[in-house]
Amino acid sequence: MSSTTGLRMPPNLRQLVLVLGDQLDHDASALKDFDPAQDAIWMAEVDEESTHIVSSKQRSTVFLSAMRHFAAALQVRGWPLLYSRLEAPDNTGTLSGELDKAISQHQPQKLVMTAPGDWRVLQSLRSVAHAHSLKLDIRDDTHFFSTVREFCEHARGRKQLRLEYFYRALRQKTGILMEGGQPVGGQWNFDADNRASFGKSGPGLLPPPSRFEPDAITQEVQALVQQRYSHHPGSVQSFAWPVTREQALSALADFIAQRLPSFGLYQDAMWEGEVWLYHSHLSCALNLKLLNPREVLAAAQQAYQQGHAPLPAVEGFVRQILGWREYVRGIYWTHMPHYAEHNALQAQAPLPDFYWTGDTEMACLRDAIRQTLAHGYAHHIQRLMVTGLYALLLGVKPQDVHQWYLGVYVDAVEWVELPNTLGMSQFADGGLMASKPYIASGKYIDRMSNHCKGCRFNPAQATGDAACPFTTLYWDYLMLHADMLAQNPRMLMQLKNLNRLPPETRQAIAAQAHQHRNAMHLAAGNTAN
């Protein structure tokens, strides 16, 4: 362990402030009363955070590089810092081990931290504090618009939790896109205006994404990740994510200027080989706390007020951050640790090997997975309605899907990833988070993309050699779970369509689905390990 500032530790250390890899915010609640004459900051790079799940090279690189840049900024301030580097010979490999060492060496009177984003990490650090009989002061994460307590108040007495009601309450609380107590434009939700595809002509000339060339710190991290986690999926070669606050602010400005105006209309659209489209690519910077959501939404709202971006685009973007982001955090912290065990549909199939390689004949999955491995990124429809949908229809064990999502994406922190995966994508919580399972046949993907045009499978066919696995599995899913789905009014239309199929057609679909599942089960192995 070493002090990267080169400053002497305060002789009687009042507070050791713990800063985690997703808490890179100089205005964090844990630092509000920081006194460099009495306090010190603790940060630690450990193998545990890249190996408790198989973290992709892009994900490990973004966390480690952002942490080292944050540490360098603390050094400029002259703040005492204990920083454990991953490659240090005495690194224990775990957060608990590194914190135990720091406490034993420097004997702080108290530990302080902002509430973490991972239940496992919270329990680990609490156990260390308890072992040393130290007070651990866990402060509300003021990065967010709402507290967990406020979410609990909202949830109390409700039989079902739904995003829309919580989102409206936060709009009223914050005044974002509000006018005279009413939503700007006279309605809360412009989803119906935000579902366009690119059509046969495609997206045309797209604005380039923000790219940040690796500096010396990032290059050092890239080499370390490549050497230490060579067997992990993905590549460090295309790394260009923002890893400092300055870069994150630049990425925000670029999104507002170049992509926000078209974001809403095309937020659900996909196109072969086009990774970035009109999306913000800001979720990683937000989840590392390099950006504050207030400044992000203020910039978006200003773009609407100045006539730069239409209301449906801005409202759709606001809902992702003020709505979904806050909502899933509330779900996570009010239902952990048991939430992680949910498997309402008793799905047990293994995750297919091609999720770690992209080697599949299904064009939509191949494109989404290969770009995920190359960049640590896919937009929300690719995650929900391609990789997530296939896993749901196939019947993959939701915990395996969760570990894949948590490991491969640069923006993945458990508080946001787990509810999105188990609740929204896999319906493993039985409807706690979402009002229905998000299922569709291959025709949805055909409507929203050009993937099917170059695919050997036909989205209109459920049986036969050219049958699209999405379509086959969609109908089979409806048959397998018909009794459960019949209790949900939002699924009745899909079940009526199922009931129109002749018995012999349903039998043929069930047989083909069984054959496909067996083939995927036999092909599943341990590619990532």
Residue ranges of predicted features:
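C-terminal catalytic domain of photolyase/cryptochrome flavoproteins
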Residues: 7-8, 20, 27, 250, ...
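A generic structural motif
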Residues: 44-45, 135-147, 415-423
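A eukaryotic "domain-start" boundary segment
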Residues: 49, 172-285, 463-471, 482-529
